[in-house]
UniProtKB/Swiss-Prot annotation:
Segments of skewed composition (Basic and acidic residues): 69-80, 165-176, 209-219
Organism in which the protein naturally occurs: Mus musculus
InterPro entries: Fam133
Keyword Phosphoprotein assigned: yes
Name of this chain's protein: Protein FAM133B
Entry keyword set: Phosphoprotein
Stated family: Belongs to the FAM133 family.
Low complexity: bias regions: 103-119
Amino acid sequence: MGKRDNRVAYMNPIAMARSRGPIQSSGPTIQDYLNRPRPTWEEVKEQLEKKKKGSKALAEFEEKMNENWKKELEKHREKLLSGNESSSKKRQKKKKEKKKSGRYSSSSSSSSDSSSSSSDSEDEDKKQTKRRKKKKSRCHKSPESSGSDSASDSKDGSKKKKKSKDVTEREKDTKGLSKKRKMYEDKPLSSESLSESDCGEVQAKRKKSGEERERTTDKAKKRRKHKKHSKKKKKKAASSSSDSP
């Protein structure tokens, strides 16, 4: 059995296109574009000059537009100038009105001040009359009420004096105690400065502390001995129990 032949013939595309011949194109070719009719230099100059001059209709239109624009500018300027003048006049009028109103307000304020001062004087007169009436009523009170008031006042004064005296005495006592404490703290406790009674008290305290220490040591020794004796008994009991079987 032989292998199948899968070879394909190679075809050159350029050669195939040449064999077909020229394509019939519908339209101008490149050669037609290159061979087009061209104007001479003189004709070009004439066209440029015409462009520079421009058309007469366009020139007339531009002139009319410029004239209209100038007229509008003049109108606008006139309006602005008239508006500025009117605004300046309005400002002057407002200033005059303010001055007039200020004068009227000053006169009204002066009148109001005078009225307020008169009302204040009336209020003061009323207050003075009320005070006089109160004083008269106090003077006309019964002498008994005045005596009771004076007695209560004297009692209150005596109580306050006693309290102040007690407070001052307490403060003095506290100050004296604090001074004594500071003196004792500052002075060193030497054998020469201490008195005989102080020495006796110190010795007694030392003896008591020594006796207490001895007692505590004796108790500790007894406890230790008791512990040792109990341990020995336990050991003997354990050894006897082990020997018996």
